[in-house]
């Protein structure tokens, strides 16, 4: 198999654009003890019973109190705090993780768990260069372990170092073809426009299973996202339902179901589901999804009220060390001050020259009234062959605004062909632009 079937440098020996890179790094932490399957698994293994993260935190806190000079205990506590962020969206746990991981590294600078944890934390905060440094340090400390490779490949992808990421993925899958490695293969293929291959790899990830129910629910949700991107709404519903069966009230899966409902113009249930999701996990991307769905439903005043919350949520993340430049740039381009979006996107691109940063800059420039400059960055955003309808929509509207009408129409048609319901707000605008 290959990571990207049309690129000869991306070969894979054994085997969604995901907005939060740390999710993959956390999968590496959570799957540290899973044994690799003999080949692509045929049947889902389900999830083993697991203690709650709160219980794990309490136990580890007691252990480090009893043995404060043991670096391993502090590293595991940092791991548990990072898992808590995944489950609650409470970014203050990043600050707690930072403190205990620094203590672990002060006690033992070459402790692999602490180095991987510190790299995961850096990725969660979108400090990809620092994440890469910690990942490389962990690999030097333990060359035969797979866990450092997850941190390294996530950082390489976000830094736009895709050829290096392909080589790292080859090694990771060869060492341990498990949930964490299959999920990364899926994302890498998705970035290169190979949604069929991405779907196949994500099915392997789900089948491989893992010891943490939330992690299994997460990859089941990613599987649903890929099915939805391919227009397979029934399969998407099934995947989201399986995630919710394993992790009741799991917010990412609930948001996925809301996206299905919004795509079917079933706005009432979608809005209710999104509002409940935001109440439990008020991440900016969920608030934006709620506001845009309300816009599509004609509830303009409610949309304005909800979108006004995004800035507050972003500030909370920033207060806990999270760099939100790309996400905030797109928000400003769509709903705020596009000129500020340009500044944020330029800063994001300087720190991490990925296709995501290029897309954010191209769209921000277009929305700020400079589509000619935006066109160049839209082309860079598509350079891997992405089939992401959002990228294609941005590129199509940019080309149209720059006077490249035929090019714009081709890109908009590609976006709608990939998924005619990719957004309750922007898919109708794409269709209107083609009329």
Where are these predicted regions, by residue range?
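TPR alpha-solenoid repeat register
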Residues: 73, 114, 148, 181-182, ...
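Canonical tetratricopeptide repeat
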Residues: 76, 117, 151, 184-185, ...
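Structural motif corresponding to the intra-repeat A-B loop/turn of tetratricopeptide repeats
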Residues: 84, 88-91, 125, 159, ...
């Amino acid at each position: 198999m290959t990571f990207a079937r049309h690129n000869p440098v991306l070969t894979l020996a054994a085997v969604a654009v995901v907005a939060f890179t740390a999710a993959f790094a956390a999968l590496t932490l959570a799957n540290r003890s899973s044994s690799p399957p003999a080949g692509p698994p045929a049947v889902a293994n389900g999830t083993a019973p697991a203690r709650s993260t709160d219980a794990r935190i309490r136990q580890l806190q007691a252990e480090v109190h009893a043995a404060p000079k043991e670096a391993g205990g502090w590293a595991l506590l940092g791991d548990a705090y990072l898992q808590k962020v995944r489950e609650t969206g409470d970014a203050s746990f990043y600050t707690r993780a930072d403190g205990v991981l620094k203590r672990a590294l002060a006690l033992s600078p070459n402790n692999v768990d602490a180095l991987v944890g510190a790299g995961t934390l850096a990725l969660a905060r979108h400090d990809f260069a620092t994440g890469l440094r910690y990942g490389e340090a962990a690999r030097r400390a333990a060359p035969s372990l797979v866990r450092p490779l997850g941190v390294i490949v996530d950082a390489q992808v976000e830094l736009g170092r895709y050829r290096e990421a392909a080589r790292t993925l080859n090694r990771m899958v060869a060492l341990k073809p498990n949930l964490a490695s299959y999920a990364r293969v899926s994302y890498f293929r998705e970035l290169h426009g190979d949604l069929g291959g991405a779907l196949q790899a994500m099915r392997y990830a789900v089948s491989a299973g893992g010891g943490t129910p939330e992690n299994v629910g997460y990859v089941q949700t990613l599987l649903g996202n890929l099915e939805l991107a391919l227009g397979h709404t029934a399969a998407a519903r099934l995947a989201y339902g399986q995630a919710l069966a394993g992790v009741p009230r799991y917010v990412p899966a609930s948001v996925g179901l809301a996206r299905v409902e919004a795509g079917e113009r079933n706005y009432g249930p979608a809005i209710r589901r999104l509002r409940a999701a935001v109440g439990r996990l008020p991440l900016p991307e969920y608030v934006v999804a709620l506001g845009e769905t309300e816009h599509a439903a004609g509830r303009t005043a409610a949309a304005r009220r909800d979108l006004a919350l995004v800035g507050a949520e972003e500030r909370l993340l920033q207060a806990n060390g999270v760099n939100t430049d790309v996400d905030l740039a797109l928000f400003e381009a769509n709903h705020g001050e596009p000129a500020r979006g340009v500044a944020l996107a330029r800063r994001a691109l300087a720190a991490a020259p990925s296709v995501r940063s290029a897309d954010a800059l191209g769209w921000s420039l277009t929305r700020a009234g400079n589509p000619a400059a935006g066109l160049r960055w839209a082309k860079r955003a598509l350079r891997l062959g992405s089939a992401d309808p959002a990228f294609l929509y941005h590129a199509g509207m940019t080309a149209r605004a720059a006077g490249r009408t035929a090019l714009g129409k081709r890109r908009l048609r590609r976006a709608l062909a990939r998924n005619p319901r990719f957004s309750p707000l922007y898919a109708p605008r794409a269709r209107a632009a083609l009329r």
